[in-house]
């Protein structure tokens, strides 16, 4: 009887291994997709202005969000966040932490095709707020639809004071978009699968607890090449 129970438990454990591996690979594939989407967006002619990217402390990418995700049972998109390393956000881009974008009026902005979102976090206060737990966009952190191309020079004071600048790409069209009312939070389950440990987003992004995983290397290498230095006013980085 005991031998049979042991055999059953071993069989169940072995059966669970492929499922666990598949879940881990799903997070790796999602992170790899974040890098692909970010590179595609930053390579288009009329994209996020370079001077804004150079002043961003963090970049968040939420790829391939479908309207159904915000209507049927779930209401969230999944992606990744990376920040400039160092005490004052002046170093190379960090290992990425997995994030979730939830609720708000996002579903009403989505069509039938997948939509990609990119969020620039423009000051340390906004970055630290996200890394603590969660942020409601527009309430806990001021946000604005980001300007694109040459529009940066003519951006309004409201836009330039925003802690987050938000963008979307859908059906080949790229534009600033309002995400007010939505919530950003760290995806602890995804981070655990990706890094094989119970790590917070702050430990991953700010504490340097892990190296960049293979699936995140394209995203981080591209950012380090595209925007190697933080060109923000040094005084604004001492919060």
Language-model region placement:
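Hydrophobic h-region of N-terminal signal peptides that target proteins for export
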Residues: 11-20
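Small-residue-enriched, tightly packed secondary-structure blocks
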Residues: 22-239
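Bacterial N-terminal signal peptides that target proteins for export
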Residues: 1-9
């Amino acid at each position: 009887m005991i031998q049979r129970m042991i055999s059953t438990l071993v069989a169940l454990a072995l059966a669970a291994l492929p499922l666990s591996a598949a879940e881990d690979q799903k997070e790796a594939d999602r992170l790899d997709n974040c890098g692909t989407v970010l590179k595609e967006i930053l390579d288009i002619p009329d994209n996020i202005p370079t001077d804004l990217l150079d002043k961003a402390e963090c970049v968040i990418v939420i790829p391939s969000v479908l309207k159904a995700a915000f209507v049927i049972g779930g209401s969230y998109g999944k992606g990744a966040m990376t920040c400039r390393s160092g005490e004052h956000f002046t170093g190379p881009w960090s290992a990425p932490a997995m994030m979730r974008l939830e609720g708000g009026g996002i579903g009403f902005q989505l069509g039938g095709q997948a939509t990609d979102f990119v969020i620039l976090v423009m000051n340390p206060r906004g970055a630290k707020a996200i890394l603590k737990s969660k942020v409601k966009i527009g309430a806990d952190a001021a946000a604005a639809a980001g300007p694109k191309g040459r529009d940066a020079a003519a951006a309004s004071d409201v836009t330039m004071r925003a802690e987050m600048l938000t963008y979307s790409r859908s059906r080949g069209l790229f534009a600033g978009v309002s995400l007010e009312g939505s919530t950003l939070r760290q995806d602890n389950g995804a981070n655990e699968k990706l890094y094989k440990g119970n790590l917070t987003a702050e430990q991953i992004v700010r504490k340097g607890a892990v190296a960049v995983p293979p699936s995140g290397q394209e995203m981080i290498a591209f950012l380090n090449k595209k925007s190697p230095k933080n060109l923000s006013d040094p005084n604004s980085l001492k919060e």
